[in-house]
């Protein structure tokens, strides 16, 4: 069997309300445990509309047919009216996920806020924003959260430093291959990072493959040994939990037939994380994704 980390990002109110229950049913049917990362504060995702002025973001939205893929309620959330509080209204679904023995971690307090502003926030603001999310999710789950995954992979040396204050078991904040410990400002290795090395649906559909070709494309990637193990695959509750739910169900069935076993990210950690190699988490770019994002780099 080939173990592949399965990360599920839940960005929005609709993704939590509609996508998570269906994903829980699908994963239970296939006897799979995964890592869910929840946005718990206001759903302001519609405020990304201003980014349509940027050619790369506009192209991405057009080629992925975003209006039908995500729905107008997601694309307009938090624009003409205050964003709904995801955690306050839908916290029970986060508890359901935890009770089903999936790994549950923090994605963001305000997904839009993190993705749009991380690059200019100072360390105190980064800590405050993370604290808002951690406190809310702790209260929802009635236990302490021990892992996180940065919204939109917006992470750099400063966010890495800021997250050290929370004692997470691991973070999944960047793209790249192979687990590592990012170097902090004082040269010490920090909390383990579990990078994502496989592309997401919206990064390749419309440029490399069609929607109908996506499963075959992804299965080929999953079955190809990574340059540095392990494979880590990210899906979104707003996509694979709603519009592409049947296609994702089929992908899981075929993956199992090919000897692929999806596992929570935390199970990829070695018994002694201190033995992981050191690395750097830096800003970079990725085909199919607009703007900068965190990337693994060698020391």
UniProtKB/Swiss-Prot annotation:
Q: Where is the signal peptide?
A: none
Keywords on record: Antibiotic resistance, Hydrolase, Lipid A biosynthesis, Lipid biosynthesis, Lipid metabolism, Lipopolysaccharide biosynthesis
Query: In the record, what terms sit under GO molecular function?
Result: hydrolase activity, acting on carbon-nitrogen (but not peptide) bonds, in linear amides
Task: Answer yes or no on keyword Lipid metabolism.
Answer: yes
Q: Which GO terms describe its biological process?
A: 4-amino-4-deoxy-alpha-L-arabinopyranosyl undecaprenyl phosphate biosynthetic process; lipid A biosynthetic process; lipopolysaccharide biosynthetic process; response to antibiotic
Gene3D superfamilies in the record: Glycoside hydrolase/deacetylase (3.20.20.370)
What InterPro entries has UniProt attached to this entry? ArnD, Glyco_hydro/deAcase_b/a-brl, NODB_dom
Question: Which cellular components does GO assign to this protein?
Answer: membrane
Sections of the chain in a coiled coil: none
- List the EC numbers from the record: 3.5.1.n3
Which Pfam family, an example, fits this chain? Polysacc_deac_1
Which NCBIfam families does the protein's record reference?
PRK15394.1
Quote the function comment for this protein. Answer: Catalyzes the deformylation of 4-deoxy-4-formamido-L-arabinose-phosphoundecaprenol to 4-amino-4-deoxy-L-arabinose-phosphoundecaprenol. The modified arabinose is attached to lipid A and is required for resistance to polymyxin and cationic antimicrobial peptides.
Recorded family membership: Belongs to the polysaccharide deacetylase family. ArnD deformylase subfamily.
| Name of the featured protein | Probable 4-deoxy-4-formamido-L-arabinose-phosphoundecaprenol deformylase ArnD
Organism of origin is Aeromonas salmonicida (strain A449)
Q: Which gene encodes it?
A: arnD
């Amino acid at each position: 069997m080939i173990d592949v980390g399965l990360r599920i990002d839940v960005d929005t109110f609709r993704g939590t309300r509609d996508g998570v229950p269906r994903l829980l049913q699908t994963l239970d049917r296939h006897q799979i445990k995964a890592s869910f990362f929840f946005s718990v504060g206001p759903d302001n995702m519609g405020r990304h509309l201003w980014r349509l002025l940027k050619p790369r973001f506009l192209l991405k939205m057009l080629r992925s047919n975003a209006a039908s893929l995500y729905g107008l309620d997601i694309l307009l959330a938090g624009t003409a009216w205050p964003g709904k509080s995801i955690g306050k209204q839908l916290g029970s679904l986060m508890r359901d996920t935890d009770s089903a023995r999936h790994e549950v971690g923090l994605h963001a307090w305000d997904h839009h806020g993190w993705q749009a502003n991380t690059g200019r926030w100072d360390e105190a603001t980064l800590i405050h924003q993370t604290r808002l999310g951690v406190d809310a999710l702790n209260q929802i789950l009635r236990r302490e959260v021990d892992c996180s995954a940065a919204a939109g992979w917006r992470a750099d040396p400063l966010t890495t430093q800021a997250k050290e204050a929370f004692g997470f078991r691991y973070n999944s904040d960047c793209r790249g291959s192979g687990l590592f410990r990012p170097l902090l400002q004082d040269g010490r290795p920090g909390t383990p990072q579990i990078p994502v090395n496989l592309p997401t649906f919206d990064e390749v559909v419309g440029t490399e493959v069609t929607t109908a070709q996506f499963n075959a494309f992804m299965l080929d990637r999953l079955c190809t040994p990574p340059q540095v193990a392990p494979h880590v695959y990210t899906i979104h509750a707003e996509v694979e939990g709603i519009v592409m739910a049947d296609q994702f169900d089929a992908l899981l069935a075929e993956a199992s037939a090919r000897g692929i076993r999806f596992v929570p990210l935390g199970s990829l950690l070695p018994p002694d994380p201190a033995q992981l190699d050191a690395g750097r988490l830096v800003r970079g770019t990725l085909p199919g994704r607009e703007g900068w994002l965190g990337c693994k780099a060698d020391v």
